[in-house]
Regions:
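Membrane-interface loop-to-helix entry segments
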Residues: 156-214, 242, 265-269, 396-409, ...
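Helix-loop-helix junctions that connect adjacent transmembrane segments
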Residues: 26, 149-156, 184, 188-311, ...
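Transmembrane alpha-helical segments of multi-pass small-molecule transport proteins
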Residues: 69, 113, 143-176, 194-197, ...
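Membrane-helix boundary/coupling elements in multi-pass transport proteins
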Residues: 92, 116-135, 236, 241-253, ...
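TM-loop-TM module centered on a large, flexible mid-protein loop between adjacent transmembrane helices
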Residues: 98-109, 144-145, 220, 264, ...
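Hydrophobic transmembrane alpha-helices that form the core helical bundles
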Residues: 77-154, 158-165, 169, 327, ...
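Membrane-interface "cap" regions at the ends of multi-pass membrane proteins
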Residues: 1-62, 76-77, 81, 494-535
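C-terminal membrane-solvent junction of multi-pass transporters and transport-like membrane proteins
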Residues: 156, 355-366, 407-474
Length: 535
């Protein structure tokens, strides 16, 4: 591609960003291939499923894992298609909360956008901590495999998770210019590792399970009835198919965001669905004794399956190390995505100390303060594991719930705005769906996401005790309470969210003057301290 073409496309994207009253502050370096690699490294369903494989083993077994995954992927594809057209129309780092601001009826758009932003950040920051922990589990699991006398303690897990988080911090701070190249490398590594792992397991395992075990044998050790156990088992699939909004938060660093970001969203879901299904099938056919697998001393059932298949500790460590590299690269991507989201929300005055968090380091063109805050929250959430295993298991549910609630609020705003205010009847971005299809996918997606968000609050074992209780509902209630409290105390006077100039003019909604956020003293927020352009 000619340099002039890249420059022209970047200028077009800068103009589109300016139409939402933002100025371009990042360097645009991500191409479509780079963003597919970046997004797939975060979605990377097959490695994500390996991290929560034990849930499926205990709640329903292979049939629930396989068919649950297929069902979740079908619904997720509909959601991704609908989400992609919003990303194409409004390619801005705020992602979900920005789209809600554009789609919801004007009377409630700011409030709904603000709440969406809180849930979005909750999901992103918690997911970063969860991924750090997964990386720690794989590293310590390999140590236990090689040295069976080594007993994994909770504090080991926390310290190694911190190491993963700090490594991600170092890459994001000292090598931000290499992120797009790293994404390309991770894409190739991901695909090659997937092929090697699948091929090795199928070739070395000589005691494969029969089709009856994989597709028909229902297993339930949760203490719940079959129906409840099935719902709990599907949670594995919900977690595995998540974070596909990643390209939307990196759009301000893409050379042709409005065209390529939607493609990256759709392609990452497609690749994740196929790789996840093939990986699950392989694991289920190659699984040995199900109780021994679930109770492996490594703490990672997948590592036990690798060892049972290869009968080689070195071979198992090679396969597990391939996945570990992908998980660490995912941590790097989640930190980049999370920090851009913090920056975007702060730019719209949605957070305390917004002026500080929305600053961009002029030399490296990165939101340095937002990066530091993001990693600090991740490490703080990892520290919960010092105290209780149940507490960190709740963080896993919070991470996925935060994403799913923010997704559902997007479609709620879409339908509410269309049917009650006749907004956004169609999108004029490079990628758009026919109106009936768009509305249909939005309605189906909303129902599916609400179902998923509710089920994340269920405990995973019965009888329910203080230790086994799922505290996700309490945590989500706290997030909701904090968002409402900060809204009524400070944000109601400061937060405005993004504004589409063309949309405002066409619909006669407000003006540049009336929509400006204000500081606590009532003065208008200026371009210099939040990166927004007001005339």
């Amino acid at each position: 591609m000619a340099a002039q073409d890249v420059f022209d496309r970047s200028m077009d994207e800068d103009i589109a960003l300016g139409n939402m009253w933002y100025e371009q502050e990042f360097k645009r370096s991500f191409t479509l291939l780079d963003m597919v690699g970046f997004s797939f490294s975060i979605v990377t369903c097959w490695t994500a499923l390996s991290g929560v494989f034990i849930i499926g083993i205990q709640a329903g077994g292979p049939p629930v894992m396989i068919f649950g995954w297929i069902g979740v992927c079908v619904f997720t594809m509909l959601i991704a298609l609908a989400m992609a057209e919003m990303c194409s129309r409004w390619p801005v780092a705020g992602g979900q909360y920005s789209w809600v601001a554009m789609l919801a009826p004007p009377r409630i758009s700011r409030q709904l956008s603000y709440i969406t932003g809180w849930f979005m950040l909750t999901g992103l920051l918690a997911m970063g901590a969860v991924n750090n922990s997964f990386g720690s589990n794989y590293i310590l699991g390999q140590v236990n495999l090689v040295f069976p006398d080594f007993v994994i303690e909770r504090w080991h897990t926390v310290l190694v998770a911190w190491a993963v988080g700090l490594f991600s911090l170092a890459v994001n701070v000292f090598a931000p210019h290499a992120l797009h190249r790293l994404s390309r490398f991770v894409l190739m590594w991901n695909i090659v590792s997937f092929i090697i792992v699948i091929t090795t397991l199928l070739a070395t395992n000589h005691q494969k399970q029969d089709t009856g075990f994989v597709f028909h044998e229902f297993r339930n050790t949760t203490g719940f009835g079959a129906s409840m156990a099935t719902i709990v088992g599907i949670l594995q699939s919900f977690f595995g198919m998540c974070c596909y909004d990643a390209p939307s938060h990196m759009t301000e660093e893409m050379t042709h965001a409005s065209r390529d970001a939607p493609k990256a969203i759709i392609m990452s879901v497609m690749m994740g669905a196929v790789s996840g299904l093939l990986f699950l099938l392989t694991l289920c056919f190659c699984m040995g004794d199900i109780e021994a697998t679930a109770n492996s001393s490594t703490g990672v059932p997948v590592i036990q399956i690798f060892y049972d298949s290869t009968q080689s500790k070195s071979g198992t460590c090679i396969l597990a190390s391939m996945i570990t590299v992908i998980i660490v690269m995912c941590s790097i991507g989640l930190l980049a995505e999370g920090s851009r989201s913090v920056y975007a929300f702060a730019r719209d005055r949605g957070l305390p100390f917004s002026g500080l968090l929305s600053q961009v380091e002029p030399k490296k063109k990165i939101p340095l303060n937002a990066i530091f805050l993001t990693v600090a929250v991740q490490l703080g959430l990892n520290a919960i594991y010092f105290g209780a295993k149940t507490g960190f298991e709740t963080v896993i549910s919070i991470a996925t719930t935060g994403f799913y609630v923010s997704y559902s609020l997007v479609f709620f705003a879409r339908l509410l705005g269309y049917f009650f205010h006749h907004q956004a009847s169609s999108f004029d971005g490079p990628y758009s769906l026919p109106l009936p299809v768009s509305l249909g996918f939005s309605a189906i997606g909303l129902l599916f996401l609400l179902f998923a968000s509710i089920t994340f609050n269920f405990p995973s074992d019965a009888p329910v005790t203080f230790q086994s209780m799922n505290y996700t509902s309490a945590a989500i209630g706290l997030v909701t309470l904090l968002s409402l409290l900060t809204w009524f105390t400070t944000a109601t006077h400061r937060f405005v969210g993004p504004s589409d100039v063309k949309h405002l003019v066409v619909n006669g909604i407000g003006s540049a003057q009336t929509l400006q956020p204000t500081d606590e003293d009532g003065s208008s927020t200026s371009k210099e301290n939040n990166g927004k352009i007001f005339s």
